Amino acid sequence: MREPSAKDVDKIEILEKCFDYLCDYGLEQVSIRKLCDRTGMGAGSIYYWFKNKDEVILDATEYGINSLIDELMDFAFEHIDNISLLCEEFPKMIEQRIDKLKVIIRVATSPMYCDSLNLYSKTFTYKYDSYARKLSQRINLPYNTIRVLVDNFVSVTIDCIICEDWGKYKRQLEYVLEALKLATIKKEKEESESQNTFTWFTTGTDL
């Protein structure tokens, strides 16, 4: 069977296979030969896409981060109005993906790769900003308020990935989401009071 040409192969497909390989075997077991076996490509094709093994690890990790962020944040965004469901289901989603998330943490904290991975930080910041702005428009809260809550959401999730304290994580999620709910209620109350004041001024009241 003919080896697929590098130009005929979608790089996203390659990155997905490389990331799955990292999750299955760990950083120490990465080799071009094993990557060839996993992707079904020859060494020449691998080097067409990547300069070396380290670039494979970094690019595959970036792919993994992006895909997992999208999966998790899309779910959170879809169910943001249902706090009890989010607090119940989101930890399950994290637990189902814990091995992949731990690989990302390992690469991000590795002395060999952390500086290089920081080059991708603008991409991740953009993603968090994008979700914060979408959520701001959906629930009519200021972007700055939402952005802080998104950062807290991400922070407690990373803490859970490292420690795997699911009870603590659920409590922290409830706290962050309740803060979001209270901010929404406060905003609605302020808007209602403002509307009532405007109505009083426009209609007038006999003294």
Regions found by a protein language model. Name each.
Residues 74, 99, 113-148, 174-178:
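Amphipathic alpha-helical packing segments from all-alpha helical-bundle domains
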Residues 13, 17, 21-55, 59:
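Helix-turn-helix
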